[in-house]
A protein has these predicted regions:
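Residues at the C-terminal ends
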Residues: 463-464, 488
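Glycine-rich flexible loops
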Residues: 1-445, 450, 457, 461
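Rossmann-fold cofactor-recognition segment
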Residues: 486-498
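Glycine- and other small-residue-rich loops at beta-strand/loop junctions that grip anionic moieties
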Residues: 174, 472, 498
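Conserved glycine-rich cofactor-binding loop
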Residues: 451-453, 475
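Conserved glycine-rich Rossmann-like NAD(P)H-binding loop of the short-chain dehydrogenase/reductase
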Residues: 467-481
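Generic hydrophobic, amphipathic alpha-helix propensity
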Residues: 454, 479-482, 486
Length: 498
């Protein structure tokens, strides 16, 4: 496929840049990863991983040994550096199969990855490490593209994959990532040696190549083909999302409603932990929340594990008319209280029904995603960035539902499978390793008198402790117009109000 033929993904490969990295496969891996991570249509923030296999001099023997460099635990492909990679002895990873005790003992394998580390400066290996290790290809990409997950999450996903790609893409049914899934990928390849990639049901895509460029191009071509197919199917079964049930007010009116409602929603969501909010009325969000199918699809939840880890099991849909009078804050709170109580009860029931004897304690039962039909989507999290990323992930989920419904029927993960991911002990350990909240975490700070002196110093220091900061200096009449300090901007002011 020629570069100009890509319509639904961005071809960013620069031959001149790649030539500068020629001979350094790890540098080319990082370059490829950054290009893939730069396009949110290819993978979500922090999602997916990439790898390459090279021959290195073994510091223990002086001889050559095969080493796999793979994105480590955490981090984002778009900003990946060498420090974010894990380097492991490939033969040691393969030898772990001898001590693998079966799927009931998956979690113990993660600690054993540490015994396979080649580069002592490595990032901690991720749970996806064996998925790369048991495929023989030099360069491998594992991504979560919306267009492909739409097919992977469709009721007829396996048949659609076979039909669309004419047998050149394999299929592995949904399974929680881990050592056994790596063995399943190897088995799929052994049974289908000529395939160019593998779809993981309700999860994502694996593609590969002999070189960094071949892997990159293969990945783009598969995702492009998926997106083009979906685009050709929209509207054939009927209107998208069953057609529009209501029409949104003008953008200015939507923003007014959002500004009026956001503090109340933040109050509900901050019942246990102080939260920061984000609002979007993106066209994709409006198409979904204004549709006839919202009531059916929203409670189903998401499919891709990355999606519900960021957005919770399902959103809260508000039963408020778009033109609701929100000036009386007390009346609004009384009207919304039952909805939040019902959501918390739903989440608690989900936890009680699905928990295991060793499950971590139930986390905050408040919603992360709140949908206001006609107006937009609110997301709440510990800081502004996390709230924004949660919104991105739910838009990913909307894209997946839209595509799956266009070609088949959307299916979400069963609640028990979702719980097993959300309350996975390995996920809990990752949460426990995160830095503790700072003094003003979850709070919104307003600094006055910040154009100079003490106020300016406070304003510059506060972002280290408070995620959202607004600062201003009022000047006497007749002097220069009011100034905002260098750390402030209109977005921060909007965040303060919302």
């Amino acid at each position: 496929m020629k570069t100009q033929e890509f319509k639904y993904v961005s071809y960013l490969w620069d031959d001149a840049k790649a030539a500068e990295l020629a001979g350094d496969e790890v540098a080319l891996l990082i370059y490829r990863s950054n290009l893939l991570g730069a396009d949110l249509r290819l993978t979500n923030y922090g999602g997916g991983n990439t790898s390459c296999k090279v021959s290195e001099k073994d510091p223990l023997t002086g001889g050559e040994t095969d080493v796999m460099w793979v994105k480590g635990s955490g981090g984002d492909l778009g900003t990946l550096k060498k420090s974010g990679l894990a380097a492991l002895y490939l033969d040691r990873l393969h030898s772990l199969e001898k001590v693998y005790r079966g799927i009931a003992h998956e979690d113990e394998m993660v600690e054993l990855f540490n015994h396979c580390i080649f580069d002592l400066a490595s990032k901690a290996p991720s749970i996806d490490t064996p998925l790369h290790a048991f495929l023989p290809f030099k360069h491998i990409d594992h991504l979560h593209p919306d267009a492909l997950i739409a097919i992977a999450a469709a009721k007829d996903g396996k048949a659609l994959t076979l039909s669309l790609f004419k047998g050149t893409i394999g299929w592995v049914e949904w399974q929680r990532p881990g050592f056994d899934l790596g063995l399943k990928l190897r088995q799929c390849l052994q049974e289908n040696p000529d395939i160019r990639g593998i779809v993981l049901g309700s999860h994502g895509l694996f593609t590969w190549g002999d070189t960094a460029y071949e892997s990159y191009l293969n990945t783009l071509e598969v995702i492009e083909q998926s997106a083009a197919y979906l685009e050709s199917q929209y509207g054939k079964k009927g209107p998208v999302f069953g057609g529009q049930k209501l029409t949104s007010p003008a953008e200015e009116d939507r923003k007014k409603q959002a500004i009026a409602l956001a503090p109340t929603l933040r109050g509900f969501c901050s019942e246990k932990t102080r939260m920061i909010g984000h609002f979007t009325d993106d066209a994709r969000v409006l198409e979904f929340i204004n549709s006839n199918d919202l009531e059916r699809l929203a409670p189903m939840g998401t499919s891709c594990p990355d999606h519900f880890l960021r957005t919770k099991i399902s959103p809260l849909v508000l039963e408020l008319p778009p033109g609701e009078d929100l000036n009386d804050n007390k009346a609004t709170k009384e009207k919304l209280a039952p909805a939040f109580e019902a959501y918390r009860a739903m989440y608690a029931a989900y936890y009680e029904q699905c928990k295991h004897p060793d499950s971590p304690a139930m986390r905050d039962a408040n919603p992360v995603v709140i949908l206001y039909p006609g107006i937009g989507m609110f997301t709440f999290a510990k800081d502004k960035q996390t709230a924004r990323v949660a919104a991105e992930f739910y838009i990913n989920a909307i894209n997946v539902m839209k595509g799956a419904e266009a070609v088949s029927e959307y299916t979400s993960l069963p609640r028990q499978e979702a719980f097993n991911i959300e309350y996975w002990l390995l996920e809990e350990a990752k949460l426990q390793r995160m830095p503790k909240p700072k003094a003003l975490s979850g709070r919104i700070a307003l600094v006055t008198g910040s154009a100079g002196g003490i106020g300016k110093a406070i304003a510059k220091n506060s972002p280290m402790k408070a995620p959202v900061l607004s600062s201003t200096t009022m000047m006497p009449a007749g002097l220069n117009r009011p100034k905002m300090s260098s750390v402030s901007n209109t977005a921060a002011i909007r965040s303060h109000r919302c």
